[in-house]
Amino acid sequence: MLTLKFQNVSSAQGIAQERWQALLWVEADFVVEVTEGILLSEPHWCIVELAEHLAAWLQIASEDGPEFYYTSMDDEQEGLLWFRPHSNGQWLVGSAWQELENANPSSFQEIQNAARQYIKRVLIESRSFMSALVAREFSSVCA
């Protein structure tokens, strides 16, 4: 099981008028949940930036790879969220900040589904924090 969740979407900087502003200003409390429990729970997560990275990865990903490795422009820490091929179509899910050891790999399909659901929800819930032009651009990148 893998779930990418968020709540309390906000933008302390106001309405994003440019793409880079949407990537970094639209934040939420973010949680990665796996079978064992909460792998990662972070406030002020750049949800739009992660959605764009996931959308780009989904365009090229298959059961064999490549791995997904997310590092935010807003943080020096690398590997804030990653998915790595493990064996027999299974993938490991982790983070540099993970709160527990994730011993149960996820299927590629579970990861795809979790990423798609996350992107879809970000598209809906972040629109009010972007200008119409930026929202259209973000929608086309993540489509």
Labelled PLM ranges:
Residues F68-S106, E110:
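An exposed acidic His-Trp-rich patch
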Residues P43-D75:
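Compact, well-ordered interaction domains used in eukaryotic information-processing assemblies
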Residues M1-V48:
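N-terminal low-complexity, intrinsically disordered segments
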Residues W97-A143:
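Mixed-charge, glycine-accented linear interaction segment located at domain edges/termini
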